[in-house]
C-alpha cells in the first residue's frame, strides 16, 4: 500500500464507525500560545479535553500535519541522520470526547492493524501502564494478546499528562517487531533502546484530573486521544526499516538526486532535503514566512539547512524551490492547499535561497579556516557567533557541519554572546508605561456599542494611576468603569472610542477605551465636578469619529479580499490599525506592490463601494463560521460564538469591530502608502470617505502648484517634466564634454613638471579653481599618459585643501598607495590602492609634507 492509501484507509475505517472526519488544523496553533507549532493530533482538540469548548460530535478522526523543530520538541539536528526523526510528519488519530473509552479504543486499534492492514499479530507488542489493570484485562482476555508479547511499564513511559495539573491518564502503546536481525529488546527491557521494536500507535486514556497536591480524581467524562505516525506505519506496511525508504520519501529523494550528478541515493543529505521540503512548504502554506524571530526564524533555519546540504551535494543553486512540484505529486491529493499555493511557496523558497547563497560560501570558507587551525576538538563560541551574526548561519547549521568532522561548539561562550546581544537590543528599545496602565480588574461591563452610541449607565469603578479609588475630582486624569457602555474598547486593530460621560453636576471626557479582563475601561479627564461610585451617567460616544472608524474598518475587509484577488491567495492579515483619519493594514507578501497592482486594488475596492452591498453581521459558532467560508485571522483566538461579517459574496470574515451599514457609506477608498515593515510583511496605509476626498484634493493642489511653477497646465505636466529631464541630460553631457576638454588641457599643461625618482614618475601639482569632478577627469587623463606614475593633485580654497592621488597599478607595493599618500598630505581620506581622495585643513608645513612624500618614494 502507498502512504496515501494507508492514510485514506485509516480515515475511512473510523468514519465508518461514527467518527467525524475533521480536517488537519494549521501548523500554527490557534488555541495554545505555549506551542510554537502543532506537534500532535490532539492540539486542535485541547479545549474540548479541558471542557472549555463543545462541538456537535463526540468522536473524531484526523490526519494531522505536525512540525517538530524549535522549542521543546526539536528534532532538527537529528533529521536525516536517523531512521525516524523528521521536522514534518503526519499524525493519524482517533478521538473520543466522553463517548467510548478503553475497550472500544483498543478493539478499534487492534482490528485496524490486524484485519484492515493485515499486520500479523505475532509481529506486534503491547505495553500498558503498570497500574492499569482494566487495559491489561482487555488486551489479554478479550483481544487474546499473548502474554509473551506484552509488558507493563512505569509512569515515565505509559502515563500521559497535559501538565503538572489537569487532565491525565494511563496510555497503552503498540509496537512493531522488525525481527531478530535488528538489534534491540522489547519495551520495558534493558535493551529497549534498540531499533527492533518501534512504537507505531499510542492510545491515551484521559480519566483523571490531577490537583495541585498531585492527587488524582476521576473525570466525569473520560476521553480517548490516540496518535499514530503515518510514516512509521507506512514503513511497516511496505516492509522497510527506515521511514526514508517509504514510497513518498523515495519519490522526493529521487527527484532531488536528478538535480545533481551521480548522487548516491543513500546519501544523508538527500534525506535531509526530502524532509525539509515537506516542513518548509506546509509552514509557508499556513502563513509562516522566513524572518529573524519566532516561527519565521525556525522556517529560515530549516531552509538554510536544506540549502547547505544541497551545496554539499553540488546541486546548482537555486534548487530547493524545484522540489515543490514533486511534493505536490505525492501529497497534493490529500492537501490541495499545496497546489493552490505552489507559486507562492516556490517564490519564497527561491528568494530565501538566493539571499542565503550570497553568504553561504563566505561563511563556509571562514568555518573551514578555523577548523584547520583548531588545536583541540572544540570550535570557539566566538566563531559560531560570528557565523550567526555576520553570515546568517543558524547555530544548529554550524553544529551540523562541525559534527560531521567529529567536533563540537563551545555553546557556553556562544550563549553568553547571544545573551549580550539580546540585552543590548532590549536596552535600545526601552519604553515608558502609560499613565493609565492597569493589569487586572474584577469588574464586568456589558457592551452595547453595536446597537447604540449613547445610553444611561452607572459607575461601578474608578481608577487613578492604575489604582482603584472612590472619587475623581475636576482636572484629575483617570478611568471610569461602567456597568453598561456603548464605548468600543480597542480590539482587533480598531482603536477605542472617545466621547463624554455626562451627569447633572459633572462631565468626564473619554480619550481612550480599553478592555481589562471583563471590564471596559474609559480613560480620560474630569472636566467638570466630581465623579464618585454608583453615580448614574449618560454615556455618549463621539459619533462623528465612530462613523469614520466604521468606514475604515469595513474598508480593511474589502482591501483584504482585494489583495487576495489581485496579489494571491497566500495573502494573510498580519495586523492592522483602524483609526478615524486613516487605517493601516499589514499582510504577508514577499515583495513591494507594483503601481499597477495598487491601481487594480483601488479599482476593485471602489467597485465594491459603488455596488453598495449591505454589510451583514451574523453570530454563529466557530465551526459553522469556518465551514461557511469565513476568513479567520492568522493566529487569532476566537470564542465559541463569533461575529461573521459579509459584504455580498466578495468578503466574509470573522470580526468583532464596528462597521458601516452598507459598503456605499465608505464613499471613496485610496491607498496613500505601501512599504515593508519586516521580512515578508508589507503595510498599506489608506484613507476613506471625507479623508480620502481631502487627500485627493491635496494631491490635486500639489499638481496645480507644480504646473504653475513650470508654466504649464496640469494636463501637460508629464510632458513638461519629461522635456526638462531630457534638457537636463543633454546639458550634463555638454558639461561632461567641457570638463573632459579642460582636463585634457590641464593635463597637457603640467606634463612638463614630472619628476623621475628611481624609475617612478612623480607629479605633485596644485591646481587653481578646479572642482572635484574636473580634478578626477584630469587625474584619469594623466594616468593614461604617464607610465609608472605617482600623481597627487590638490586645490586650496579658504585654507581648506581637496586632494586626489593616483598610483599606476604596475608599481602598487613598490610605493605608498594612493590612500596613504592622501592621508599623509591632508590627514583625512581614503579609497583604493590606485585611486584615493581626501580633504581637510591645509597643513602648516605643506612643503615639508610634499618633501616627505618624495623621500618615502626614494626609500622604496
Swiss-Prot record:
Cofactor stoichiometry and binding remark: Binds 1 zinc ion per subunit.
Cofactors: Zn(2+)
A GO term, aspect molecular function: zinc ion binding
EC number: 6.1.1.7
Residues holding Zn(2+): 553, 557, 655, 659
Reactions mediated catalytically: tRNA(Ala) + L-alanine + ATP = L-alanyl-tRNA(Ala) + AMP + diphosphate
Protein role: Catalyzes the attachment of alanine to tRNA(Ala) in a two-step reaction: alanine is first activated by ATP to form Ala-AMP and then transferred to the acceptor end of tRNA(Ala). Also edits incorrectly charged Ser-tRNA(Ala) and Gly-tRNA(Ala) via its editing domain.
Database matches in PANTHER family: ALANINE--TRNA LIGASE, CYTOPLASMIC, ALANYL-TRNA SYNTHETASE
Comment block on domains: Consists of three domains; the N-terminal catalytic domain, the editing domain and the C-terminal C-Ala domain. The editing domain removes incorrectly charged amino acids, while the C-Ala domain, along with tRNA(Ala), serves as a bridge to cooperatively bring together the editing and aminoacylation centers thus stimulating deacylation of misacylated tRNAs.
The protein's name: Alanine--tRNA ligase
Gene that encodes the chain: alaS
Amino acid at each position: 500500500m502507498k502512504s496515501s492509501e494507508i492514510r485514506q484507509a485509516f480515515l475511512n475505517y473510523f468514519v465508518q464507525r461514527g467518527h467525524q472526519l475533521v480536517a488537519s488544523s494549521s501548523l500554527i496553533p490557534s488555541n495554545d500560545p505555549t506551542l510554537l507549532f502543532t506537534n500532535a493530533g490532539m492540539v486542535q482538540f485541547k479545549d474540548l479535553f479541558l471542557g472549555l469548548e463543545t462541538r456537535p460530535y463526540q468522536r473524531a478522526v484526523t490526519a494531522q500535519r505536525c512540525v517538530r523543530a524549535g522549542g521543546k520538541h526539536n528534532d532538527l539536528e537529528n533529521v536525516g541522520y536517523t531512521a525516524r526523526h523528521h521536522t514534518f510528519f503526519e499524525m493519524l488519530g482517533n478521538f473520543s470526547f466522553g463517548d467510548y473509552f478503553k475497550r472500544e479504543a483498543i478493539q478499534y486499534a487492534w482490528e485496524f492493524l490486524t484485519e484492515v492492514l493485515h499486520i500479523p499479530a505475532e509481529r506486534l507488542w503491547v505495553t500498558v501502564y503498570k497500574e492499569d489493570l482494566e487495559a491489561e484485562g482487555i488486551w489479554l482476555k478479550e483481544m487474546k494478546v499473548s502474554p509473551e508479547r506484552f509488558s507493563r511499564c512505569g509512569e515515565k513511559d505509559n502515563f500521559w499528562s497535559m501538565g503538572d495539573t489537569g487532565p491525565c491518564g494511563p496510555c497503552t502503546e503498540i509496537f512493531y517487531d522488525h525481527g531478530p536481525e535488528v538489534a534491540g529488546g522489547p519495551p520495558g527491557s534493558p535493551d529497549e533502546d534498540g531499533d527492533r521494536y518501534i512504537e507505531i500507535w499510542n492510545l491515551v486514556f484521559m480519566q483523571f484530573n490531577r490537583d495541585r497536591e498531585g492527587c488524582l480524581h476521576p473525570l466525569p467524562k473520560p476521553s480517548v486521544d490516540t496518535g499514530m505516525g503515518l510514516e512509521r506505519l507506512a514503513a511497516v506496511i511496505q516492509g522497510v526499516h527506515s521511514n526514508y525508504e517509504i514510497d513518498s520519501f523515495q519519490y522526493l529523494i529521487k527527484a532531488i538526486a536528478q538535480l545533481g550528478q551521480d548522487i548516491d541515493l543513500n546519501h544523508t543529505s538527500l534525506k535531509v532535503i526530502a524532509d525539509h521540503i515537506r516542513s518548509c512548504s506546509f509552514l509557508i502554506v499556513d502563513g509562516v514566512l522566513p524572518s529573524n524571530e519566532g516561527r519565521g526564524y525556525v522556517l529560515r533555519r530549516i531552509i538554510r539547512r536544506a540549502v547547505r546540504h544541497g551545496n554539499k551535494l553540488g546541486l546548482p543553486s537555486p534548487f530547493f524551490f524545484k522540489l515543490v512540484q514533486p511534493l505536490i505529486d505525492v501529497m497534493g491529493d490529500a492537501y490541495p492547499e499545496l497546489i493552490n499555493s505552489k507559486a507562492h511557496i516556490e517564490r519564497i523558497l527561491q528568494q530565501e535561497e538566493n539571499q542565503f547563497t550570497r553568504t553561504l560560501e563566505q561563511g563556509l570558507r571562514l568555518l573551514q579556516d578555523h577548523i584547520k587551525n583548531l588545536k583541540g576538538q572544540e570550535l570557539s563560541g566566538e566563531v559560531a557567533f560570528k557565523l550567526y551574526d555576520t553570515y546568517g548561519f543558524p547555530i544548529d547549521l554550524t553544529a551540523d557541519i562541525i559534527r560531521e568532522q567529529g567536533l563540537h561548539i563551545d555553546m557556553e561562550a556562544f550563549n553568553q554572546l547571544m545573551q549580550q546581544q539580546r540585552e543590548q537590543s532590549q536596552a535600545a528599545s526601552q519604553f515608558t508605561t502609560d499613565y493609565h496602565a492597569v493589569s487586572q480588574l474584577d469588574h464586568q461591563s456589558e457592551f452595547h456599542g453595536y446597537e447604540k452610541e449613547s445610553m444611561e449607565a452607572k459607575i461601578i469603578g474608578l481608577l487613578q494611576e492604575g489604582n482603584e479609588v472612590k472619587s475623581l475630582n475636576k482636572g484629575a486624569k483617570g478611568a471610569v468603569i461602567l456597568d453598561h457602555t456603548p464605548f468600543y474598547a480597542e480590539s482587533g486593530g480598531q482603536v477605542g472610542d472617545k466621547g463624554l460621560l455626562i451627569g447633572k453636576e459633572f462631565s468626564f471626557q473619554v480619550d481612550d477605551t480599553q478592555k481589562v479582563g471583563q471590564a471596559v475601561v474609559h480613560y480620560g479627564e474630569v472636566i467638570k465636578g466630581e465623579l464618585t461610585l454608583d453615580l448614574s451617567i449618560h454615556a455618549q460616544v463621539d459619533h462623528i469619529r465612530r462613523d469614520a472608524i466604521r468606514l475604515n474598518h469595513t474598508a480593511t475587509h474589502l482591501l483584504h479580499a482585494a489583495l487576495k484577488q489581485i496579489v494571491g491567495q497566500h495573502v494573510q492579515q498580519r495586523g492592522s490599525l483602524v483609526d478615524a483619519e486613516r487605517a493601516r493594514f499589514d499582510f504577508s507578501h514577499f515583495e513591494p506592490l507594483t503601481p499597477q497592482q495598487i491601481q487594480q486594488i483601488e479599482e476593485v475596492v471602489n467597485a465594491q463601494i459603488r455596488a453598495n452591498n449591505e454589510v451583514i453581521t451574523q453570530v454563529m459558532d466557530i465551526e459553522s463560521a469556518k465551514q461557511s467560508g469565513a476568513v479567520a485571522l492568522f493566529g487569532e483566538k476566537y470564542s465559541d460564538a463569533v461575529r461573521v461579517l459579509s459584504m455580498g459574496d466578495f468578503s466574509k470574515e470573522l470580526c468583532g469591530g464596528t462597521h458601516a451599514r452598507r459598503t456605499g457609506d465608505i464613499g471613496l477608498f485610496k491607498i496613500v502608502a505601501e512599504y515593508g515593515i519586516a521580512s515578508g510583511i508589507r503595510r498599506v496605509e489608506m484613507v476613506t470617505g471625507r479623508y480620502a476626498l481631502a487627500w485627493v484634493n491635496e494631491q490635486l493642489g500639489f499638481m496645480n502648484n507644480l504646473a504653475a511653477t513650470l508654466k504649464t497646465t496640469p494636463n501637460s505636466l508629464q510632458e513638461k517634466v519629461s522635456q526638462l529631464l531630457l534638457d537636463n541630460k543633454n546639458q550634463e553631457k555638454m558639461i561632461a564634454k567641457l570638463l573632459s576638454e579642460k582636463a585634457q588641457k590641464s593635463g597637457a599643461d603640467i606634463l612638463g613638471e614630472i619628476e623621475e625618482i628611481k624609475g617612478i614618475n612623480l607629479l605633485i601639482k596644485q591646481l587653481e579653481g578646479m572642482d572635484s569632478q574636473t580634478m578626477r577627469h584630469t587625474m584619469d587623463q594623466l594616468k593614461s599618459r604617464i607610465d609608472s606614475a605617482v600623481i597627487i593633485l590638490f586645490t586650496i580654497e579658504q585654507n581648506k585643501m581637496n586632494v586626489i592621488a593616483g598610483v599606476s597599478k604596475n608599481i602598487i607595493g613598490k610605493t605608498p598607495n594612493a590612500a596613504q599618500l592622501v592621508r599623509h598630505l591632508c590627514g583625512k581620506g581614503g579609497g583604493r590602492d590606485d585611486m584615493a581622495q581626501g580633504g581637510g585643513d591645509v597643513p602648516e608645513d605643506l612643503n615639508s609634507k610634499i618633501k616627505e612624500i618624495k623621500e618615502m618614494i626614494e626609500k622604496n
